[in-house]
Swiss-Prot record:
Any Pfam family hit: PPR_2
InterPro entries for this protein: Pentatricopeptide_rpt (IPR002885), TPR-like_helical_dom_sf (IPR011990)
Organism listed in the record: Arabidopsis thaliana
Domain of life: Eukaryota
Organism ancestry: Eukaryota, Viridiplantae, Streptophyta, Embryophyta, Tracheophyta
PPR repeat boundaries on the chain: 130-160, 166-200, 201-235, 236-270, 271-305
Name of protein: Pentatricopeptide repeat-containing protein At4g14190, chloroplastic
Length: 501
């Protein structure tokens, strides 16, 4: 047990009241979720994080401990504060207080102060000059990409204290250099490790594979695998999942599938993020059969699909005119652990609207009503486009009236639908007069409709004309000063149509 110094005791005696708790949480927590996203390389390493509090000594008084820790944090937060001066004033810090200071400096991006504080603190007690403490300091510096400081600490432990760097220290340095694309430096320390009698492990090569994937050096991944085998490192499930993800991101589908088959034949664990990577790769190349097979596995396993990936799948179906699949996709993401989102309803409405199926559209609308799903701009415009395809002007008028009563916000797409219909056989005079009366046409132009609607239906004549007149007005005094309202935009479109021969 460490005793409190006189300076610490006198400093606590000056506190008039209990200070607020420190602005950080000393306990680590892991959040569990059923939603998966494709991880970046840094998340794939399997080494357990070093605990900042792992070797903290028990303070004389828990109350005094928290008071001093809080006071120390406040003093560090002051403008112009110097941790070395504070250490001198306090005489010494316990391990718990020291690592709290290091974490504060790290979170405050004061990385250049970490090593001087560590050097001063460790020299106060010879037992602090240890491989474990150096490992933690070097790990922090490598994670923050402060490699010059990390290497200085690395050289100090070898040259000044004749300590042998651990495998974890070498891995931190190798992975950090590789992640920055500095592979020459990474290989230097890999060889340095071997020269010092430490053999790389699977995790060492996993980090290199991650980095090569990040920098799209896929041929180097293959060479890395050969070096891995020559060093006697066996690929485990982490390595195989990693390889599948990296090859899928690079669009190397053949290699991706080879790694997948190897993993499955060895009955290793297939990670959810790996399946998601494969699905995205198949969608990217428009391989519908394989895309659907993988998507069905994901939904069956209850893995949530990211909205961006769902949109990518939907666009593949739309580009291939496979509109009926949109309903299946919408139902699929609703049935999985993903809750019924607006996107799911959008897909289902789009399916039947694009197929011009009144029965299907009415059925989905009924389901929405039963589920008490509120209407929005996208839903409204999908229904309006469907009715316009059917030539059902009565339903259009009724829906517009209902939308007004329900206070559903309309946008430029809605205006465009009515405008284009007015050019045909629909009498939109009453609609425009109502919009003018309630002030809608004098509002700034907005585009709230989901882009999938444009992908499925294309842009109408009015929207294309709007883009033309807007492009013509860009850079002009009138275009910069005039407020772009629906009324103003319609006037410009009409004027432009009259001037076009």
């Amino acid at each position: 047990m460490e005793n409190l110094t006189t300076a610490q005791f006198l400093h606590r005696a000056t506190l008039l009241k209990k200070p607020p708790p420190p602005p950080w949480n000393l306990n680590s927590s892991f959040l569990t979720s059923t939603s998966y996203s494709i991880p970046r390389p840094s998340s794939l390493r399997r080494s357990l994080p070093l605990s900042i509090n792992g070797d903290a000594t028990q303070p004389t008084s828990l109350l005094h401990h928290h008071r001093f820790l809080s006071s120390l944090t406040r003093r560090l937060s002051l403008s112009g504060s110097c941790p070395l001066r504070l250490l001198q004033e306090d005489g010494d810090w316990s391990k718990d207080h020291f690592w709290a200071v290091i974490r504060f400096l790290r979170q405050s991006s004061r990385l250049h102060e970490i090593l001087p504080v560590f050097d001063t603190w460790k020299n106060l007690e010879p037992s602090r000059i240890s491989e474990n403490n150096y490992e933690r300091i070097i790990r922090f510096l490598c994670e923050e990409k402060s490699m010059s400081e990390a290497i200085r600490a690395f050289r100090s432990m070898i040259d000044d204290h004749e300590l042998s760097p651990s495998l974890e220290i070498y891995n931190s340095i190798i992975h950090s250099y590789a992640d920055d694309g500095k592979f020459e430096e990474a290989m230097f320390y890999l060889n340095h490790m071997k020269e010092n009698g430490l053999l790389p492990i699977t995790e060492t090569y996993d980090g290199l594979i991650e980095a090569y994937g990040k920098w799209k050096m896929y041929d180097e991944i293959v060479l890395c695998l050969k070096r891995m085998e020559s060093d006697g490192c066996v690929r485990d499930h982490v390595t195989y999942n990693l390889l599948i993800r990296e090859f899928s991101r690079g669009g190397l589908l053949k290699r991706m599938e080879q790694m997948y088959q190897s993993l499955m034949s060895r009955k290793m664990t297939l990670e959810p993020s790996t399946l998601l990577s494969m699905l995205e790769a198949y969608a990217e190349f428009g391989l519908i059969e394989k895309m659907e097979e993988t998507c069905n596995k994901i939904i069956r396993f209850g893995i949530s699909l990211d909205e961006g990936l769902v949109r990518k799948l939907a666009n593949v179906y739309i580009e291939n005119l496979m509109f009926s699949r949109l309903d299946d996709l919408g139902r699929g993401i609703s049935a999985s652990r993903t809750r019924r989102t607006e996107l799911a309803w959008c897909l289902r409405l789009l399916c039947h609207a694009r197929l011009v199926s009144r029965k299907g559209l009415d059925y989905v609308v009924k389901e929405m009503e039963e589920a008490r799903v509120p209407w929005n701009t996208t839903f409204a415009n999908i229904a309006l486009l469907a009715y316009s395809k059917m030539g059902d002007f009565t339903s259009i008028e009724l829906l517009l009236s209902e939308l007004r009563i329900k206070h559903v916000k309309l946008d430029l797409v809605t205006v465009g639908i009515v405008f284009d219909l007015s050019e045909a056989r629909f009498d939109g005079t009453g609609v425009f007069m109502t919009w003018k009366k309630i002030g809608f046409l004098d509002k700034p132009v907005e585009m709230k409709t989901d882009p999938l609607v444009h992908a499925a239906f294309g842009k109408g004549q009015f929207l294309r004309s709007c883009e033309e007149v807007k492009n013509q007005s860009l850079g002009t005094r009138d275009g910069e000063s005039k407020s772009w309202t629906y009324q103003y935009l319609m006037e410009l479109v009409v004027k432009n149509q009259k001037t076009v021969p």
